Design a protein with these regions (language model features):
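C-terminal edge and immediately downstream basic/flexible tail or linker adjoining helix-turn-helix-like DNA-binding
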Residues: 2-5, 97-99, 125-127, 152-161, ...
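Structural recognition of an alpha-helix C-terminal capping motif at a helix-to-coil junction
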Residues: 37, 51-58, 71-83
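N-terminal module of bacterial RNA polymerase sigma factors
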Residues: 1-34, 182
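Amphipathic, Lys/Arg- and hydrophobic-enriched alpha-helical face
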Residues: 28-46, 63, 130, 175, ...
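Arg/Lys-rich amphipathic alpha helix in sigma70-family domain 2
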Residues: 66-68, 79-99, 171
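Internal acidic/polar
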Residues: 3-9, 95-119
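Sigma70-family region 2
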Residues: 16, 44, 57-72, 92
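A short pre-motif secondary-structure segment
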Residues: 140-144
C-alpha cells in the first residue's frame, strides 16, 4: 500500500527548490499505482502502460512550476495521463492503416497473450467489451467503475459537464451490457 500524504504538505514542499524533489517523490509514491492501472485499462499492454506512466511523471515534473492549486493534484495528474493515453492511442491508430478493426483486434490479441493479465473469464469478457467503446466512453467508464471517481472530478479532468459524463457512462454501461448479454 502506498503512503498517503497531505496534499497541502506536498504542495508546500514543491514551492521550495530545496524540497521540490522530495515533494515530487511523495507524489510518485502516492499516485503511481492508481495512475498505472488507469493507463493500463486504456492501453492494456504492461510495457506501454509503464512507458506512459513514466511520460506522465516526466511531464508533471517538467511542468510542476505551472501547477495551480485550483484543482486537486490528482486531477492534474489524471489529466496529464489522459493526454498521454490519447496521444499514444492516436499514434497507434495512425500507424495502423490496414483497417478500422485492426487496432482493436491487435489490442485484443495483446490482452489475450499478456502474461500480466490475471483476470478470470468474466474480467476478460469485460475488457473485450470495453475495447468496443469509443475512447472517451472507455475512459469515463474506467474512472467511474474502477476508480470510483466522482463526476465532478472527472469534469475537471475532461473539461466537460457532469451531465455529459453521466450520459457517456450510461451509454457505455448499456453497450457493455448488450455485448456481455450476446456472449451468454
Amino acid at each position: 500500500m502506498n503512503p498517503s500524504y497531505n496534499e497541502r504538505e506536498v504542495l508546500a514542499l514543491l514551492q521550495e527548490e530545496s524540497t521540490q524533489k522530495r515533494g515530487f517523490e511523495m507524489i510518485v509514491a502516492q499516485y503511481s499505482e492508481q495512475l498505472y492501472w488507469q493507463i493500463r485499462r486504456m492501453v492494456l499492454s504492461h510495457e506501454d502502460a509503464n512507458d506512459l506512466l513514466q511520460n506522465t511523471f516526466v511531464k508533471a515534473w517538467l511542468n510542476i512550476d505551472y501547477f495551480r492549486a485550483e484543482a486537486k493534484l490528482s486531477t492534474w495528474l489524471y489529466r496529464i495521463a489522459l493526454n498521454e493515453c490519447l496521444t499514444f492511442l492516436n499514434k497507434q491508430r495512425a500507424a495502423s492503416t490496414v483497417s478500422l478493426d485492426a487496432p482493436a483486434a491487435d489490442t485484443l490479441q495483446k490482452l489475450e497473450s499478456d502474461p500480466y493479465f490475471s483476470g478470470d473469464k468474466a474480467q476478460m469478457a469485460l475488457q473485450k467489451a470495453l475495447l468496443t467503446l469509443p475512447e472517451k466512453q472507455r475512459m469515463v467508464f474506467n474512472l467511474k467503475y474502477y476508480q470510483e471517481m466522482k463526476y465532478e472530478q472527472m469534469s475537471d479532468i475532461f473539461g466537460t459537464s457532469v451531465g455529459a459524463l453521466k450520459a457517456s457512462y450510461h451509454h457505455a454501461v448499456k453497450k457493455i451490457e448488450k455485448i456481455l448479454g450476446e456472449e451468454d
